């Protein structure tokens, strides 16, 4: 096994449940009573293509040196010392406690890389705990449900990002993986060695009641704060004709048709050459953090002067960050020939932002409150698409059809072979295609796949990630076999 992860956190946050999920067996005792785990337990684990060792630890406790709790804490500290990285688990439903803060500081002092894991994220009320988790100083929380297996693709990505592909895909493990036979029937064995998960291919329905995080961005004076004030029905944010009044990222709670919304108003984002003051640089950085924390980002454009260079740069940033974009053409009340202007704006949207074909764009007047319901309907629909998951069976039946319709091209006299496709993540949708010679695959054929996915599975207007892998197993083959 190439690396070791220690699962740590205060008692009863779900550490042993996550341990069982990763090893594929119920090896650790799980109970609602704090302190069930007293010793550290180590076992081989598997998370999709990642093979590693995982250590389950006792819940961190503040205790006297001679007490049982103190000895449990010593075991946990030893596990942190032995591990290459730490999965610091919090209970998103219960929120952050003083104990979480105390032990987060201890983990930071250890100097070990950390993934902040927000467990029980499926529970109602967990969103507040997610927001509070940022105060621990351990980075962006990765929301999961260890009990139900939700969020495992995102946890896998977070581990790879933390340790780096070179570290987690070591050659000695790839030699083993290269010999594995991978077929659609084997998908259920990818999480854990012997896991029996009856819900493995069950695609959960979109939860339209779950709280939603929305960032509102745009050039200075595009009307972002005015829009939020109208949504909230109060003058919560300072507005005026002067560009750049908003200095930091301000959040506000809102409810739309019974759904809880967290709105982030951001400082106007200027070109780098125009960002001079230190305070303004910090404001723009704060806005970037808001984008990364948001799920959907509303790009507010001034309909009287839309699609300037900076508007396109902001949109490109949002797409590269993998967020779900929606355009609001603001100040629509100032437009005279609305039908002609709207047709022109739709044409420019499709032409200037082809990487998110079908991007939703809505004319509004933030000052008069016109078009806000229509805007929010499009926000919710875009969020649903951004969260969409497609079963492996449907994907590969579709793949057979598109290959039959348009076979992969021949490169250097040899036809490329496409073998298999699976979805490895959502938010945004991410897919892996197993093929021969991925480096030789023309980008035009990759776009053919992406455009086909959009059309067939109704996924307009969101970023779609598609990676090519060699080997029959789309998760293997990242390193060449030793000669």
From Swiss-Prot:
HAMAP family per record: GTPase_Der (MF_00195)
Domain KH-like, chain residue ranges per copy: 388-472
Subunit and partners: Associates with the 50S ribosomal subunit.
EngA-type G domain: residues covered: 3-167, 212-387
Protein name as it appears in the record: GTPase Der
One biological process term in Gene Ontology: ribosome biogenesis
Pfam family, one: MMR_HSR1
PROSITE patterns assigned: G_ENGA
Residues bound to GTP 2: 218-225, 265-269, 330-333
Family classification: Belongs to the TRAFAC class TrmE-Era-EngA-EngB-Septin-like GTPase superfamily. EngA (Der) GTPase family.
InterPro entries referenced in this protein's UniProt entry, alphabetically: G_ENGA (IPR031166), GTP-bd (IPR006073), GTPase_Der (IPR016484), KH_dom-like (IPR032859), KH_dom-like_a/b (IPR015946), P-loop_NTPase (IPR027417), Small_GTP-bd (IPR005225)
Keyword GTP-binding in record: yes
Keywords: GTP-binding, Nucleotide-binding, Repeat, Ribosome biogenesis
Purpose: GTPase that plays an essential role in the late steps of ribosome biogenesis.
Binding-site positions, GTP 1: 9-16, 56-60, 119-122
Example of a GO MF term: GTP binding
CDD domains, A to Z: EngA1, EngA2
Keyword Nucleotide-binding: yes
